[in-house]
Structures are given as structure tokens and as C-alpha cells.
Amino acid sequence: MKYLFYLIFPLLIFAQDPSFHEPWKLEGAGERIEKYRKTNTILNFNFPTDIKKKNGKLKIKLINHDFKFGVGFTQLRKMRGNMFDLYLERFKEAFNYATVGMYWVLTDERSSRKQIDKYYDDIIKWSIKNNVRLKGHPLMWHEGMPDWVRYSKDLDELEVAMKTHMRRLIETYPEINDWDVYNEPVGPFKPHIPYSAIQDWINYKGGIYPAMVEIYQFVNSVNPDKNYSNNHYHAKDPEYFKINEYYVQKNLNFSSIGMQAHMQSNDNVMTESQVWDQIEDYAVLGKNIQFTEITVTSSKRFNNWKDHQEFLAKRDESLRNGKEMDLPSLPEYEDFQASYLKDFYTLVFSHPSVSSITFWNLTDKNAWRGHAGGLLYKDLSPKKS
């Protein structure tokens, strides 16, 4: 019995090591990919008679994939010079879709926007040239706004400003076909959310549900042909399912349900069954499913959200004092990131209801919350992922 204990105990420790990823079973994933992501086709070529008698070589190249393999471009606007160009080159090696941050605080019509406007124009021109599809994120949110919006006292004037802002984004950037309409729609009144007048406007309209209906109806009155979607940080929140079900019942015109998955603490790392069951739960609503913001770090994860918050508070204080406080990328967690993402992408890609996966940070440079959440190091050299 003593020897059996010595055999089992190390195995238990190894299995509980948060840097170890036990490979997923992925039962049926390969077959589903063959069925839903590939197809047979017949190409007919009509040549003049004189050419038919000649031998030649035909080269066929896949220009793009229907599935959207994405990255969040929130880091790109902070890149300069050669780093900017290298970032885009690295992006093209694996991705065909990008989420462009268009938060109201960046696109504020009451401030000088020349630099950010040029950035957007340059990205759109580049995306057209390189067959990259874009998503604008978001048209409206209860965070990331200028102070004149946050502390607005006249709710009728605020409503005009909100609708003017959403119209301006849709009409100014017609090349962008995908838009997150209202980011995190069941989140405005969560305890951790800071005050904004948009919360007052939501109450003024009768609550979250009627306010969201009005927003969706408005953006569709501006342009009904866009791919409108929503997005939330916890798709497992039953309120998020309920509001999407309500949208469907109201016959609102939207194409996709967005799910975030920022796995920066051990309790947020999704298992194979959790990922699959979450997709299946939402698939019954008949909409495309987008994994909109994925983070799998190669830095040491926190045990839980409380530990994570303590770090974020210290990091915020450090940044206020002009000092960076980023978590280092560690070899054992780089192994985890690579093996976990291989399984995650395989499983999600195999489900016919999923239309996109967007990895939030391409690089550790300026990565969200200071985690080593990129697929590239800060110098833009690749990790194992």
C-alpha cells in the first residue's frame, strides 16, 4: 500500500499543475471539420481550340477562408514604425479577420481625431488590399466613453448624441460589414461597473431590454445589411442567454452571438465539455456564434478573480507612477498555451454554428491587463503557439 501511495501521489500533483494541459478527446472533431469546413467542387475551364492542344500548369491558391480567424487590433494603434509593419506581417501569417477598437472615447466627435481617423483609414485600406475582413467594436457601450457623455444630465440630448455617434461610425466606415452593436448588454448594472449616464438612459427607456431593442432597431434603420452582433464576458451568465432569446423573439435583425473567454485565472480556464456545452446551448437560437475575445496566457495564471483583482489594483497604481508591471512569459505556460489552443481551436472550428474565433492579443506588447496573453513575444517573435 505504501508503494502504491508513492506512485499515485506524484500523478495527482502533476494532474493538478495549472501549467499542464491534458489533451482533449475531441471525439468527432475531425469528421465534423471534413463535413462542415470542406467541400468538393468542379471547375470548368473553357479555352480556345488552339490552347486546348497545349500542355500547361494550373496553380490554384486559396485566397481566403469562409471561417474568420481573427485578432483584436487594440494593440496595433500603439505600434510605431517597423513594429507596426512587422505586426501586420505576423498577422497575415495566420489570420484573415480583425476587430478594430472604435470606443467612443477614441472617436469622440468633440475632440481632435486626426491621428485616430488616419489610423482607421490606413487599416481599412490595408485590409482591402490584403483580403482581411474587419469588425468595428463597439457601436455603443456603458464604458470607454468621453466625460461629456459619462456625466451627461439631459437624457434626451444624450439619446441624440448616442444615435448620432452610432450613425456616424456605420456611415463613415462603409467598408466594415461586422459591428458589435452594444457591448456586454447585460452588464450595465453589475456591481463592478462604474457610473455613466448611459445607465441612466437605459433606466429612462424602461430597462435593459427595451433600451437594447431601441438601439438595434436604430442601427438597422441606418443600414440593415450589416452583420450585427453582441458580445459578453460571461456567456454562461443565464441573463445573457435570456436577452439573446428575447432578441430572437422580437425578430431583431442581428447575425451573431458573441462570447468572450479571457482565461487569466485558473477558475476561468474552460474545459472541453464547458466549451462544447456552451456552444450547444446557444446554437438552439439559430444565430452564428462568435468567440470574440479569447485570451490564453503564457504567464502564470491567478487562482481566482479575487487574486487577479489584487494584482490589477497594484498594477494600476504602478502605471499611475509611470512604471510598467507586466507578467513574464514562462516556458511551462508557453507549453500550456500552445497545447490548449490547439485543442480549443480544433473543437470550436469543428462546430457548424461557430463563424469566428478572435484571439484578443497578438503580442505580449501592451497586452491587456499586463498578462503575457499574446501569441508573440514583445519583440513580435513567435511563441510555441
What does each model-found stretch correspond to?
Residues Y36-K38, I42, K59-L106, I124, ...:
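An acidic-aromatic substrate-binding cleft motif
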Residues E34, D180, P185-F218, Q274-G286, ...:
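Aromatic-rich peripheral "rim/lid" segments of glycoside hydrolase catalytic domains that contact
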Residues E93, Y97-S111, K118-N227, Y233:
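Substrate-binding cleft and catalytic face of glycoside hydrolase catalytic domains
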Residues Q16-L76, E109-R110, K135, V149, ...:
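Beta-strand-rich domain onsets/edges
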Residues L76-K92, E157-L169, D237-Y247, A338-L347:
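Short, acidic/polar
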Residues T74-D85, E89, A197-R320:
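Noncatalytic carbohydrate-binding groove/subsite architecture in carbohydrate-active enzymes
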Residues Y3-I13:
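Sec-dependent N-terminal signal peptides
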Residues D66-G70, Y97-T99, N131-K135, I176-D180, ...:
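Structural preference for beta-strand elements that scaffold enzyme active sites
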